[in-house]
Amino acid sequence: MKEACSSSSHVPVSDSKYILKSELLSLLKTYNCYHEGRSFQLRHREEEGTLIIEGLLNIAWGLRRPIRLQMQDDRERVHLPSATWVPERLSYLQKEASPQDSKVPTEEPGTQPANKAEVSGDSSGALEGEEEEVPQLMRTKSDASCIIQRRSKSRAPSEAQKIRRHRFSINGHFYNHKTSVFTPAYGSVTNVRVNSTMTTQQVLTLLLNKFRVEDGPSEFALYTVHESGEQTKLKDCEYPLISRILHGPCEKIVKIFLMEADLSEEVPHDVAQYIKFEMPVLDSFVEKLKEEEEREIIKLTMKFQALRLTMLQRLEQLVEAK
């Protein structure tokens, strides 16, 4: 059966589940119609009889703990030579740079970040806070890829507190460039370019590399979360892009979330249907179930008491017959 399904007429959904290619193409057509005129439309092609679909896959952040980013880029930290750093040049730079300029990341001339962080469709985020008071150029593997740090004049206590914290906001997320800790806003969406042959582990690795996350893919998992609260983990052998197409294009109904592997668990449909009820309603459900349980207990007790009585009567009849 598996060999038959592995033919050119089927597309794998996991290592043991297949879908007809014609059915998948029909779902893909619906998916692209929903995203018509947008960059989330998917392209498809065939290579040696194998259907390959590729495009952007939206993934929502569902982390409960901050994640740690790599502090250093592939290159070493670049310090400006002390011989060329003279007071005249410092005063010249301070005149050239406005206070607002010191709050935004500046890119090195002629270079482009290897992986540009795309969160909720914004191309770049504002960095809120002041830099460290040491003149050097720091390159990090995050959205705050290049930060010029310079000397500054005396500041108000509130500004000094920001310097001590070294805490920035990147598109609504919090990033501490001293500890390299990143806290994505829950439910915010990023995306990665994938294809239908990439497994869950490969997509996880791609996403973590994009944000230069130090933790390995084994510490995270992808979940499909339904609007009802139903939550299903994508297995390592599954293909997230195929799963997205099968669940439909509307992310108000189903989203794919990145979560911690040790803090998340699946929520079956039977449990999910009770999640959104208020506590008083749930308490009333529990009371009704208790009442029903008590009625069933009484019913079963009476039934077996009647059976016991019948058996005792029969035993007495047998004894008398002897």
From Swiss-Prot:
Pfam families: Nore1-SARAH, RA
UniProt protein name: Ras association domain-containing protein 4
Coiled-coil regions, chain positions: none
PROSITE patterns tied to this protein: RA (PS50200), SARAH (PS50951)
Sequence ranges assigned to domain SARAH in this UniProt record: 271-318
Superkingdom of the organism of origin: Eukaryota
Subunit structure: Interacts directly with activated KRAS in a GTP-dependent manner.
Function: Potential tumor suppressor. May act as a KRAS effector protein. May promote apoptosis and cell cycle arrest.
Gene: Rassf4
GO biological process: signal transduction
Keywords, ordered alphabetically: Cell cycle, Phosphoprotein, Tumor suppressor
Region (Disordered): 96-161
PANTHER family: RAS ASSOCIATION DOMAIN-CONTAINING PROTEIN 4, RASSF
InterPro entries reported in the protein's UniProt record: RA_dom, RASSF1-6, RASSF4_RA, SARAH_dom, Ubiquitin-like_domsf
Residue numbers carrying Phosphoserine: 142
Domain Ras-associating: 175-264
